[in-house]
């Protein structure tokens, strides 16, 4: 945890930046790199009766770490995706509550 769900980026592109991205994110979140999951979603966009490329979008699901960490996290994701030649990228955060997140059937607020 955190989980990154990425669309509009090819898997082979994302794989190229995945290690340096996770290294930077781990430093921002002050946790190990093994805490991160990155999923590259294969989606198909449609608009005005046409098939179009999906817009580059990253959804981050995590436990809140504050404005500063969130800002740095979004900037790091943006920087690494833009390094692939993708000029436009959006990042959105979904925040989990520890009392509603379970690991191995146990609530995180009770671990």
How should each PLM-predicted stretch be described?
Residues 1-111:
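Interaction-mediating elements
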């Amino acid at each position: 945890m955190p989980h990154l769900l990425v669309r509009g980026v090819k898997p082979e592109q994302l794989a190229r930046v995945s290690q340096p991205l996770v290294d930077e994110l781990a430093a921002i979140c002050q946790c190990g790199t093994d805490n991160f999951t990155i999923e590259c979603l294969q989606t198909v966009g449609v608009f005005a009766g046409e098939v179009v490329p999906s817009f580059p979008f990253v959804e981050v699901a995590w436990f809140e770490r504050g404005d500063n960490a969130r800002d740095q996290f979004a900037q790091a994701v943006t920087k690494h995706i833009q390094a692939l030649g993708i000029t436009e990228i959006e990042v959105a955060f979904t925040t989990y509550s520890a009392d509603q997140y379970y690991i191995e059937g146990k609530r995180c607020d009770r671990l």
